[in-house]
Amino acid sequence: MHAPPTATRRSGPRRTHGIMARLVRLAAGVLVVTLVIGALTALSADDAKTHPHKVCIHDELQQSLLDSVAQQGLAPQRVSRVGLPYVASATAAPAAQVGGVDFALAGDSAPDVTRSAEWGELRITVSAEELTDPAYHCATVGQVISNHIDDYVTCTADDIMTAEKLDILMNYLIPEALQMHKDRLQVQQVQGTWKVARMTSYCGRFKVPEEHFTTGLSNTDFVLYVASVPTSPGVLAWANTCQVFSNDQPAVGVINIPAATITERYDHLMVHAVTHEIAHSLGFSNAFFTNTGIGQFVTGVRGNPDTVPVINSPTVVAKAREHYGCDDVTYVELEDAGGSGTMGSHWKIRNAQDELMAGISGVAYYTSLTLSAFEDLGYYKANYSNAETMKWGKDVGCAFLTGKCVVDNVTQFPSMYCDKDENVYRCHTARLNLGSCEVTDYTFDLPDYLQYFTVPSVGGSADYYDYCPYIVRSPIGSCTQAASSASPFVSAFNTFSMASRCIDGTFTPKSTGGATVTAHLGMCTNVACNTADKTYSIQVYGNGAYIPCTPGATISLDTVSDAFEAGGNITCPPYLEVCQSNVKGAMDYESMTNSGSGSSRPAPVEPSGSGSGSSAATTAPSPTRDGSAAADRIAPRTAAVALLALAVAAACV
């Protein structure tokens, strides 16, 4: 994801100034920078905790588990072709001590389970006993606990599992994520009772109710054990499959959702991050792709001499042809960049940036691409009527998949890729952020197949995108950030909330937040979504009322708000681009129209384990909000942002 350390940003065109003016500005800038360095350190640290850049470490963890299982020396018939152990039998069996880990023996072959002949709801049991046991999660600052991977960590204030965070986790994040899968995937349900085998590696570090080993689980097709312990910087959550049924279908999984990443109830990024990780535990993984035969390697992709992982199964190919509008598709690329945590278990972000199973965080739509991969594994039946729509790559044709994104300095796909470094805000394609195009000039020439500009050392800033230039999200431009902590610069023309989305336009705010960069091509507006009629209204900066926004219509900003200069406007995007998966936007509409009584949210999950097979039970403890603590956190951030605004002003005059 990151540019090589030798890369330097290639600046776009700027106004010419006199030498004296430059010296004055430089002196002012040096003074401000001297003041701001300490504040920026605190600001960047706070941003990392509040809006971390998602890094997926799935494959790295999966390989660690596979290596651990292989080292146990289990009989071949007790290990699946995926390399994971089978669940224990549903009847009593002796136990063997293997390498310090108890495994329930299944006999001479994998334990069979009886399945329904019909397809039915995917029943997921959630066990979260760790969240009520202070020995397994951060209960006090300075406490030392296992991170469930390979180390012990010291708990900080951000790591504490407060009552509010527990409420968000158990009553919103997990139920919403589970429902995303249950609405779209069916299984041939397991009949009767089955038992979990005692586990090794990081799977064995999760707290499992003893009855899951002895009595077993019923009415359950998959059991998920939940932890909340600190993890590596930039990781929102991680999950994996631990055990499988006799047909290699995932049966047991684990997920860790660190308390430090739980901040807001309707956080779109976190809901989809949890959904993404649960998908890995359900089998969206290189290990399953390879061992079921749907994953392959090809060479020569867009001139790339290296082998590239792909899926070439029939349903995936058919759905890709529909999405991209290309009948020549014979495979869909998986990620070949990003290292061992990302390669092979995600769609290639160049081709599917906004998909649920792309390798970095984003809007993460659950599209027919991911559904078809699940279906072609053979374990699931997909409900394509509930597939979400992704604008990225939609009907762009074969050239997008086979050709270059930019040719002779000109983008071939302007809705996705750009070609000029710029100093203006516009909407990121996912509409959750403001951003700008970044073009980088490296100190070396890029390979021929990655050269898009007449200068061979120039390209985009990320290897994930094959160095295609794209709209990079601004670190201060999240539409869903708290308004109270937003910088003065972006606060001058945006509205922020969990329902806010970015809308394209051309306008100049009357207030510039201390900077002289005044013209913009996008703004964050609150969105209220009428899910019944597929219509929406928006609230722009400077106007407390919501106004209808008809897709394709242009709104003159000076007619609806006094905050903008005359002549500015915005253009209403399609309904799906601002309302699909916008849970808070739908709730805000219901609240405004007093029609919320009929709405239903997924049931909460109980923070304790049982073998009943139900993923919905009693609610978690009621949260208690600490307003004073929140104010204390905001105050230093606000000061840092104020100093940052001064630095921006000094640099932009």
Curated annotation (Swiss-Prot):
Tell me how the cofactor is bound: Binds 1 zinc ion per subunit.
Low complexity: bias regions: 607-631
Where would I find glycosylation on this chain?
383, 409, 569
- Residues engaged in binding Zn(2+): 276, 280, 346
Please give an example of a GO cellular component term from this record.
Answer: cytoplasm
Entries under SUPFAM superfamilies matching the protein: Metalloproteases ('zincins'), catalytic domain (SSF55486)
Molecular function via GO: metal ion binding; metalloendopeptidase activity
Disulfide bonds listed in the record: 138-155, 203-242, 326-398, 405-468, 418-437, 427-502, 479-524, 529-579, 549-572
This chain's function reads: Plays an integral role during the infection of macrophages in the mammalian host.
User: Would you tell me the protein name for this molecule?
Assistant: Leishmanolysin homolog
Which species is this record about?
Crithidia fasciculata
